[in-house]
């Protein structure tokens, strides 16, 4: 395990989170910053959008920037859904929004360049992580400064990943001991694995507002010799 000062853990400069929430994906909703999600994965199509900038075939993709487009795909084949084309009677990709990048034309066409290799939706070239199927809120309280922040996190994220989310609020967050109800958290475990239960279903069953009770993680500063 690498070390920073006296604190063991991953190098956060190169740390890659595994999960992204739908709200995070929704923030990337412009041609110059274009993400989509489908079939449980998140994809950064910004470079594709730049490559085909000004091309009408990009329009259907730009229209769904920041959204989940799982309904475009057959979950069994992970390919674009297909249908019998009423004009040709052939099996074609189903594109209700109109044909988009890398989808072949309806009829044979001599000016269609098909030398792009794999279509953008096949393979993992554009993949940046997984989509959090379920999220929850967690409060993080810095006991040194009494500052409190509430984060939306994926239920399968480790504490390290939650720490990475928290860095914009406290760039020295890895120099703190993270505790819940007086016990040190295992940074490699999820909230649930650390005993921080998700009680949303219980609140729903009781017809109570779950936002009135959000668990809190307390941060205690360590003098770990890392740069302030």
Curated annotation (Swiss-Prot):
One of its GO terms (biological process) is cilium movement. InterPro entries: Cyt_B5-like_heme/steroid-bd, Cyt_B5-like_heme/steroid_sf, Cytochrome_b5_domain. Heme binds at residues 52, 83. It comes from the Eukaryota. Keywords: Cell projection, Cytoplasm, Cytoskeleton, Heme, Iron, Metal-binding. One of its GO terms (cellular component) is cell projection. Residues 17-83 form the Cytochrome b5 heme-binding domain. It is found in: Cytoplasm, Cytoskeleton, Cilium axoneme. Pfam families: Cyt-b5. GO terms for molecular function: metal ion binding. Radial spoke stalk protein that binds heme under oxidizing conditions. Required for the coordinated beating of multiple cilia maybe by functioning in a redox signaling pathway. Belongs to the cytochrome b5 family. This is Cytochrome b5 domain-containing protein 1. It comes from Homo sapiens. The gene is CYB5D1.
